[in-house]
Amino acid sequence: HICVFSIKKLMKSKENLVFLGMMGSGKSSIGSLIAKRLKLNFIDIDKEIEKELGTSIKEIFKTKGENYFRKFEEKITLKRLKLNSVVISLGGGAFTNKNIRKEVLRDNLSFWLNWDEDILLNRIKNSKKRPIAFNATVTLAEPSIKLPGFPV
């Protein structure tokens, strides 16, 4: 069970509740459930990008490339992080962006959803919606985010 009182109390000194984690970690599912329990709006950054560009993330990667996607992801994410009292689910690679990372850590309550790599692989292996799941240059056993002070 989610301790809504504890999260609300923690959020009083913070702007938003932000969920981080690798692809398939449950950021969108958990974020949506917690937003409902807290009676707050939920923002899924991947869905926001698809809505703004009118196409799927898979198609964006295919037609415009990852660099285009990452720049647009940064723009949308930084804009949404300026809102107050919302629950936000970031894209799986968003936290590798130094501007997004800085803003998330500045005035937001954030949770990193961490799972065993076998669980993550099982969650994403049959998904057609994950454009870089198996084209990545790193493996799930070797985290793509290696930052001092942020164990992954």
Outline where the language-model segments fall.
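Walker A/P-loop
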Residues: 28
